[in-house]
């Protein structure tokens, strides 16, 4: 992922934050009692398409 006008250090921070957020989302999704909405959710956010 590249961000226009960001230093490499800032890009790393942003990328790491996104990675952590996606991991949190994965954990939340896997904790759901039903898997029915998961495919829609993951399609919207690309959660399972790294």
Swiss-Prot record:
The keyword Hydrolase applies. It catalyses: Endohydrolysis of the N-glycosidic bond at one specific adenosine on the 28S rRNA. It comes from the Eukaryota. GO terms for biological process: defense response to fungus; killing of cells of another organism; negative regulation of translation. Its EC number is 3.2.2.22. The keyword Hydrolase applies. GO terms for molecular function: metallopeptidase activity; rRNA N-glycosylase activity; toxin activity. Keywords: Antimicrobial, Fungicide, Hydrolase, Protein synthesis inhibitor, Toxin. N-glycosylase that inhibits protein synthesis by depurinating ribosomal rRNA, and thus acts as a ribosomal inactivating protein (RIP). Has adenine polynucleotide glycosidase activity on the poly(A) substrate A30-ssDNA. Inhibits cell-free translation in rabbit reticulocyte lysate system with an IC(50) of 1 nM. May function in the defense response to pathogens. Displays antifungal activity against C.comatus and P.piricola, but not against R.solani, M.arachidicola and C.gossypii. Inhibits mycelial growth in P.piricola with an IC(50) of 2.5 uM. This is Ribosome-inactivating protein lyophyllin. It comes from Lyophyllum shimeji.
């Amino acid at each position: 992922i590249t961000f226009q006008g960001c230093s490499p250090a800032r890009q790393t921070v942003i990328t790491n934050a996104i990675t952590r957020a996606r991991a949190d989302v994965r954990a939340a999704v896997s904790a759901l009692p039903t898997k029915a909405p998961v495919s829609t959710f993951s399609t919207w956010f690309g959660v399972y398409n790294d």
